[in-house]
Amino acid sequence: MSAVLRSLPSHAPRTAEGVLAEVNALVGQLRARAPETERLRRMHPDNLRDLTEAGVFRLAMPTDVGGYQAGEDIVAEVLAQISRGCPSTGWMCTIMVVANVIPALLADEAADEIYATPDLRTTATIAPTGQAVPVDGAYRVTGQWTWNTAGVHSNWFAPACVVPGEEDWGLRLTLMPTAEVEHQDNWRAAGMAGTATNIAMVNDVFVPSARTILVNDLADGRYPARRYSGVPYFSRPFVMYINAGSAPALLGMARGAMDCFMQTLPTRGAITYTGWSKAAEAPLLHHQLAKAQYHLEAAEMFTSRLSALYRGVLHTPATIMERAQARAYIGHIASLSRACVNQLFEASSASHTLLAADIQRYFRDINVLHQHAAIQPNSGDEVYGRVLAGLEPNSEIV
């Protein structure tokens, strides 16, 4: 294990709380860079530098490889605050922070190889649009994945594949260096425009078996015997962590929209074609603002509940009910966060539809991310309802 980094870089904060403090100080800069992030259609280079130096991508990595192995509440708050400043940047960080856990779930030889990568940033997709053909002690992977968020900023890629002859076992996640992946610069979207969610293409890439794991095992928390086997932090169902780790980005967008609304409210003048000379004095706006705040507070509570749910399976196996709850909660947090942002946008003036107004970005971004297949509330509600009714879940993302 000599190749693995055992300590934090000299510039990094000493604690996860230190990471949060640095991120809190960056929120304003992230927001100021958001228009350029959208124009670039990828992470602003200054954001990537600042967040890397702040230690963000090490948050959930093992301590023996220079990570913080941070608690759920700290990870959630860091990711929410990044999204508060820039939703696109927050979502890319979410993907890479969560996926940087994957090597700790693999055999030691794979973990050592991947965690030896300086400034590790992993991206992943569970959409099974590739094929992994078994060869002696390995797989040869070919495929195309259309939703590789932040792939151009990563150094490892973890796509899910169908394996001929293993259909009864389900999908297999494979890990390969991003240097072996070609990205098609195709991401042009109405929202989350800066996430570099491009097509990733792989052609006959050799992946040792140690760098693979069944998606069903990730869902159930079944991992090979390894150095981290006795560490509860890395023994929980990873798919459940995807749900718990993704929710804060949605909450952060609602916080950011509230920031923008409250910053402009004191200087807003008349509500056109009404008798109100100051928007802040209008009863209608008071009702709209109260409703938005209720939605924000509810999203905060459900995000805390989801973190507590995941923390609660540190020492006891997760039940299928808990896994279904995690799947449903992220959708509910998405609905609450979107309701908050949409209410605030409705309460804003027509001038806030201009691209120079920050709130319109949160409006576009939350409505686009709400459509994400792994977040979409109707799917999560169905899974949760089935389990409540005594049926098996009908989704692999549980």
Regions found by a protein language model. Give the residues of each.
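Glycine-rich phosphate/cofactor-binding loops in nucleotide/flavin-utilizing enzymes
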Residues: 348-398
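Glycine-rich beta->alpha junctions and the first turn(s) of the following alpha-helix
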Residues: 191, 197-296
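Generic structural signal for well-ordered, non-transmembrane alpha-helical segments
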Residues: 21-24, 252-255, 290-297, 331-338, ...
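Short, structured patches in soluble enzyme cores that scaffold and shape functional sites
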Residues: 134, 145, 160-163, 175-178, ...
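DPxDG-like acidic metal-binding loop motif
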Residues: 144-187, 196
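Glycine-rich flavin
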Residues: 43-53, 57-154
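Basic/polar N-terminal segments that are highly enriched at the extreme N-terminus
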Residues: 1-21, 25, 397-398
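C-terminal helix-coil-helix/basic helical segment that borders enzyme active sites and/or dimer interfaces
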Residues: 31, 35-38, 297-332, 342-353
